[in-house]
Amino acid sequence: MTATVSFGPWLRATLLGWLLGIVLVVALALAGEGLGIGGSQISVGLGMGLGVGLFQERALRFRIGPSRAWLWASALGLTLPFLVVDLARLLGHPIPYSLYATIIAAGVSAGAAQARLLRPLGIAASAWVTASTVGWTAASLMGALADSFTAWSPVRGVPGALLYLGVVAAGGLLLGAATSVPLRTQAYPGSLE
């Protein structure tokens, strides 16, 4: 019996979910433009929440059950801070917006929403929320690093685009590595077999 989630499958699931999330963010943003709600930030949280949530849920399905609870906790938790920003703007009370700060807030809210699903496995809510926050912070820093390339990187064209995408993809790896820690170290013996 093992009490841990294997690092490789969790990392792979999170990375694949991250990559799907990027595609979904773009698709939702384009759909928003078509519907006349361009500039809405909700697509960022919803797209990443659905992408990462779907693949992580698949990795956890034999541990937390076959429900869609993890997917919805991820999607709602990651969407909430972006929704607050959008609603404040719509209500005429815009708040200062930082993509990276909002991603960090989304890590907190997603971690809180997901933590209740991990409680039966023996994973402390504080450990999961911390890991989620650290993971999403690291992912947002990779996005900020990639965004800064246009200012300082001499790499241009296709190589520059590939470098950019590689750095952005590394955000998914860091998210997976950070969130794997409580899964690998805190679960009750046998709860994650």
Stretches with model-predicted labels:
Residues 1-193:
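Juxtamembrane/disordered regions of integral membrane proteins
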